[in-house]
UniProtKB/Swiss-Prot annotation:
Its cofactor is Fe cation. Residues 38-194, 210-370 form the VOC domain. It is found in: Cytoplasm. This is 4-hydroxyphenylpyruvate dioxygenase. Gene3D superfamilies: 2,3-Dihydroxybiphenyl 1,2-Dioxygenase, domain 1. It comes from Plectranthus scutellarioides.
Length: 436
């Protein structure tokens, strides 16, 4: 556990050179090796699924909609499904292996030994990023034939239609393929029972609608980018170098991979060395004991409403946010986004600590939580994308993937905020050491 795939390390392109955001030319070769429709769900492994899921439910406005635990006949693990719009989070923790009947597990890829090693190394963390495909079996075969490291072969679930399979993504995180039969009820996977009557679901809703992107931190970009591109066929959607995003003290390099529809986005970060301070990416890798999911970006339909609801709960069981930018940031904002945001909206952005960036296609509004667990690793990003509306073949409107970019103009502010947070933690450790 905690080591990069040997398959990933063995596949090295002839040349890997980042050109930076300014020189990067975006194109979509439509090169997927198997159809990828959307993010299906994210599964977190933790020590206590009940309380962890309740904290995320309260903090993000995601009600509990389905469960698989002792009450449903599952003696292997407790899993609780939260949902808001198309966004699905699953939280899984094991029961005692000595009392469990492994065949009762609703997620057949669950492993007691893997869970124990995973949570010991990483604490609360993302175990699986699931994508919906036409056929889990076909996607798995196509991926493995192109170098993907197999984790769990295809399994057909209890409804005899839904199937899942897993391959290595990075670190101890897996990419899970999910295909649903024509009879799927849309709730989740067979073996999960629906909770409640839907009334509470309507009441607990802060406006979050889907997963926009899942960001991974890795020691080295080159082998991981090449590994993922080779077995998925995903293309490079964007890239950033330390010169694009760094501060005077630390930095990163980043590549964003996308599927054909550009609605499944996988940004990947590596640390930069030789700076005054250790890169935040390296800090993550140290505390996470290896590569893993750094943050999940969640799309909201109204970021002002979402942030008002989340901030009301920050001190009472919800999530805290990174410090807001200085007032000068917002004084300069009107010249950058005044044609998209009204004076009242810019004022609301300052009040809530929302960052704004834009590219030649659209505008991005974003904000970041502090780490959501005990370790300074995993955090959440809340975003709203404005613009880039397109018509599909049926004449329906949709928003182009990645509209407004990934906040290149805000990386500096984010890094400064994280640096100050890390300095605060370090000062506490130094004080404690001096007093010992």
């Amino acid at each position: 556990m905690g080591q990069e795939s040997t398959a990933a390390a063995a596949v090295v392109p002839a040349e890997f050179k980042l050109v930076g955001h300014k020189n990067f030319v975006r194109s979509n070769p439509m090169s997927d090796h198997f159809p990828v429709h959307r993010f299906h769900h994210v599964e977190f492994w933790c020590g206590d699924a009940t309380n962890t899921s309740r904290r995320f439910s309260w903090g993000l406005g995601m009600p509990l909609v389905a469960k698989s635990d002792l009450s449903t006949g599952n003696s292997a693990h407790a899993s609780y499904l939260l949902r808001s719009g198309e966004l699905s989070f699953v939280f899984t923790a094991p029961y005692s292996p000595s009392l469990a009947e492994p065949s009762s597990a609703s997620i057949p890829t669950f492993s007691f030994s893997d869970h124990r090693a995973f949570t010991s190394s990483h604490g609360l963390a993302v175990r699986a990023v699931a994508i919906q495909v036409d056929s889990a079996s076909s996607a798995y075969s196509a991926a493995v034939s192109r170098g993907a490291k197999p984790v769990s072969p295809p399994v057909v679930l209890a409804d005899c239609e839904t199937a899942i399979a897993e391959v290595h993504l990075y670190g101890d995180t897996v990419l899970r393929f999910v295909s649903c039969g024509s009879g799927a009820d849309g709730w989740f996977l067979p073996g999960f029972e629906v909770v409640g009557d839907g009334v509470s679901c309507q009441e607990l809703d802060y406006g979050i609608r889907r997963l926009d992107h899942a960001v991974g931190n890795v020691p080295k970009l080159e082998p991981v980018v090449d590994y993922l591109k080779k077995f998925t066929g995903f293309h490079e959607f964007a890239e950033f170098t330390a010169e694009d995003v760094g501060t005077a003290e630390s930095g990163l390099n980043s590549v964003v991979l996308a599927n054909n529809n550009e609605n499944v986005l996988f940004p990947l970060n590596e640390p930069v060395y030789g700076t005054k301070r250790k890169s935040q990416i390296q800090t993550y890798l140290d505390h996470n004991e290896g590569a893993g999911v750094q943050h999940l970006a969640l799309i909201t339909e109204d970021i002002f409403r979402t942030l008002r609801e989340m901030r009301k709960r920050s001190e009472v069981g919800g999530f805290e946010f990174m410090p807001s930018p200085p007032p000068t940031y917002y004084r300069n904002l009107k010249s950058r986004a005044g044609d998209v945001l009204s004076d009242e909206q810019i004022e609301e952005c300052e009040k809530l600590g929302i960052l704004i960036d834009r590219d030649d296609q659209g505008t991005l509004l974003q904000i970041f939580t502090k780490p959501v667990g005990d370790r300074p690793t995993l955090f959440i990003e809340i975003i709203q994308r404005v613009g880039c509306m397109m018509k599909d073949e049926e004449g329906k409107m949709y928003q182009k993937g990645g509209c407004g970019g990934f906040g290149k103009g805000n990386f500096s502010e984010l890094f400064k905020s994280i640096e100050e947070y890390e300095k605060m933690l370090e000062s506490k450790l130094v004080t404690k050491t001096a007093m010992a």
